[in-house]
Swiss-Prot record:
This is Ecdysteroid UDP-glucosyltransferase. The gene is EGT. Glycosylated. One of its GO terms (molecular function) is UDP-glycosyltransferase activity. Its EC number is 2.4.1.-. Keywords: Glycoprotein, Glycosyltransferase, Signal, Transferase. Belongs to the UDP-glycosyltransferase family. Residues 1-18 form the signal peptide. SUPFAM superfamilies: UDP-Glycosyltransferase/glycogen phosphorylase. InterPro entries: Ecdysteroid_UDP-Glc_Trfase, UDP-glycosyltransferase, UDP_glucos_trans, UDP_glycos_trans_CS. It comes from Autographa californica nuclear polyhedrosis virus. Catalyzes the transfer of glucose from UDP-glucose to ecdysteroids which are insect molting hormones. Acts on the host at the organismal level to block its development, thereby increasing the yield of progeny virus. It comes from the Viruses.
Length: 506
């Protein structure tokens, strides 16, 4: 009997310690995959075997782990990429800005079609045809289309992971507070005033993503067969949402245990040791008169798409700051025929962490991406944010609220307005740095208490351990309101009945 008990215990431990996991991360964004890579490597270090469906950006499996990492190249076709870029160029403002007005189902359909093409890739089709079994499916939260893999590998439960903020639809899926025009605004918004117009914007965004889900349903049935469940039904399999974010940035949203805020900065947890700057850049920074201003709009922004007037607005601003050395990450092709001010140094790439930690660094002009702001907080460098897409608008707004940055409207900002914001963070640097130190200390305190990567792995393994009984309320992390239509959640029929009964008495 004792031997049987030990065998049962060993079987249970093995089920968790050597799980077969499928991860599906189709969005070809470098800033997303530097987060996913760390998470996947941590799973492999815990002896899990992970198969990753991803674009060919960079390799995940760079070391030898207790578990295996198998990469399935799901690169989109060159033609599809060109089509996506061409279509998006038609609605971007100033060449690069995709604000709330541009967030429509029609504009985002190209992204869903890109996912479809990736899953039609011969490598992915071969994976599906192999009839391999998995104990867990992990998909990126931004790509609901990828939830179909939870259906293909049923009964494996599903986890969604985001490199930063979650979508309102993600919170709906797991039963968290998803929407409020003021306290929990949709991350696709670019204006955060307490106005009736923004209430209408929230309603429009809800409708657009409903339309996009219906478009996705049609493509799913076309690709995987007429019996493929809808997005709404596929969401029922999601048991956990992991967010690479500290809850303070999300207004301390009330959430059930099915949402775990990891604290942010996961890409820094196992980053390579800080390397030295090139001697040339180091020398340029050391001899700067008043300091150095670093300008980078991240890895997802194509600087070749800058509208000319926006490009020259930036150049004219930098020219005015002639006491400062400007390090500007921009494609060489953009500026090769432009005579730049003497204080401006451009490159395709800079060692961002090393630049930000240099003793002469004074300010950081950024798109407001989460990974960039993590590195700015780490270095204590005040930011001026020019958000251009996605959650950058909300994050920039939140950074300004917390007193560590200035946020500007990239669609309308002028050289004078940008200069005022830059001078503000330069001349009031002690105040900004104080706020940054306080925020960084708070975040680090919580990370020391709940290490981000440990938290992600432990909750992942909890879902794996109880995968056979996940439908039982005893084991579920979700609330009973998870994925419930708003008409049912707000009990419209009951409310209507009460109102009608009340009216009949008059």
């Amino acid at each position: 009997m004792t031997i049987l008990c030990w065998l049962a215990l060993l079987s249970t431990l093995t089920a968790v310690n050597a799980a077969n996991i499928l991860a599906v991360f189709p969005t070809p964004a470098y800033s997303h995959h530097i987060v996913y890579k760390v998470y996947i490597e941590a799973l492999a270090e815990k002896c899990h075997n992970v198969t990753v469906v991803k674009p060919k950006l960079f390799a995940y499996s760079t070391k030898t782990y207790c578990g295996n990492i198998t990469e399935i190249n799901a690169d989109m076709s060159v033609e599809q990429y060109k089509k996506l870029v061409a279509n998006s160029a038609m609605f971007r403002k100033r060449g690069v800005v995709s604000d709330t007005d541009t967030v429509t189902a029609a504009n985002y359909l190209g992204l869903i079609e890109m996912f479809k093409d990736q899953f039609d890739n011969i490598n992915v089709r071969n994976l599906i045809a192999n009839n391999q079994t998995f104990d867990l499916v992990v998909v990126e939260a931004f790509a609901d289309y990828a939830l179909v893999f939870g259906h293909l590998y049923d009964p494996a439960p599903v986890i969604q992971i985001a490199p930063g903020y979650g979508l309102a639809e993600n919170f709906d899926t797991v039963g968290a507070v998803a929407r409020h025009p003021v306290h929990h605004p949709n991350i696709w918004r670019s204006n955060f005033d307490d106005t009736e117009a923004n209430v209408m914007t929230e309603m429009r965004l809800y409708k657009e993503f409903k339309i996009l889900a219906n478009m996705s349903n049609a493509l799913l049935k076309q690709q995987f067969g007429p019996n493929t469940p809808t997005i709404e039904k596929l969401r029922n399999k999601v048991q956990l949402l992991l967010l690479n974010l500290h809850p303070i940035f999300d207004n301390n949203r009330p959430v059930p245990p099915s949402v775990q805020y990891l604290g942010g900065g996961i890409h820094l947890v196992k980053s390579a040791p800080l390397t030295k700057l090139s001697p040339v850049i180091n020398a340029q920074m050391n001899k700067s008169k008043s300091g150095t201003i670093y300008v980078s709009f991240g890895s997802s922004i194509d600087t070749k798409s800058f509208a000319n007037e926006f490009l020259y607005m930036l150049i004219n601003t930098f020219k005015t700051l002639d006491n400062y050395t400007i390090l500007w990450k921009i494609d060489d092709e953009v500026v090769k025929n432009i005579t730049l001010p003497a204080n401006v140094i451009t490159q395709n790439w800079f060692n961002q962490r090393a630049v930000l930690r240099h003793k002469k660094m004074a300010a950081f002009i950024t798109q407001g991406g989460l990974q960039s702001s993590d590195e700015a907080l780490e270095a204590g460098i005040p930011m001026v944010c020019l958000p251009m897409m996605g959650d950058q608008f909300y994050h920039a707004h939140k950074l300004q609220q917390l007193g560590v940055a200035r946020a500007l409207d990239t669609v309308t900002v002028s050289s004078d307005q940008l200069l005022v914001a830059i001078n503000d963070v330069l001349f009031n640097a002690p105040t900004y740095k104080k706020h940054m130190a306080e925020l960084y200390a708070l975040i680090n305190h919580d990370k020391a208490t709940f290490p981000p990567l440990d938290k992600a792995i432990k909750f992942t393994e909890r879902v794996i351990r109880y995968r056979h009984d996940i439908s039982r309320q005893l084991y579920s992390l979700k609330t009973t309101a998870a994925n419930v239509p708003y008409s049912n959640y707000y009990m419209y029929k009951s409310v209507f009945s009460i109102v009608m009964n009340h009216l009949t008495h008059f």
